[in-house]
Amino acid sequence: MKQLFLIIGAPGSGKTTDASIIANDNANITHYSTGDLLRAEVASGSELGKTIDSFISKGNLVPLEVVVNTIITALKNAPTNTILIDGYPRSVEQMLEFDKVLKNQSEVNLKGVIEVKVSEEVARERVLGRARGADDNEEVFNNRMKVYLEPLNEITNFYAKENIHHIINGERSIEAIVADMKNLINELLK
């Protein structure tokens, strides 16, 4: 049985960095981002990959069901039994579809949804300070923040009702955040 942790957080919360460090430090943990999974599926040349490519190549959004199937396929084929996925779900629709698919199978168990919590001010400082790409400007940041915040309460309430929502304070050093996240994951795997 694969044990899954979803890592969510605002743009600039450090969720991707935290998950990467944890997976790099532990050979028994695999870390994926949704975008990487879709690109890998396309690269594999599978039927699912061809379907995904038909949307991406035209600049269209990949349909919800296809994204969820891609994630589930990757989880089942993951090289380890413990998996971290960051930045998912991004919408209530994604969450509900993912939940439905997870409940209809027995190979993957959602152990926890870990929210790396930072204030909007800290997120803004980090994103606009890192200048990682063309999308790291104030206007784009504000839009990404809005897209993140709009469904957040509904997403966290849904997982809180399932007793799997956990919050980690993301406004500390990477070392402190990673240590807390590692401890939480280890506790939940017991």
From Swiss-Prot:
Catalyzes the reversible transfer of the terminal phosphate group between ATP and AMP. Plays an important role in cellular energy homeostasis and in adenine nucleotide metabolism. The gene is adk. It comes from the Bacteria. This is Adenylate kinase. Pathway: Purine metabolism; AMP biosynthesis via salvage pathway; AMP from ADP: step 1/1. Residues 129-135 are annotated as: LID. The lineage of its organism: Bacteria, Pseudomonadati, Campylobacterota, Epsilonproteobacteria, Campylobacterales. The keyword Nucleotide-binding applies. Residues 33-62 are annotated as: NMP. One of its GO terms (molecular function) is adenylate kinase activity. Gene3D superfamilies: P-loop containing nucleotide triphosphate hydrolases.
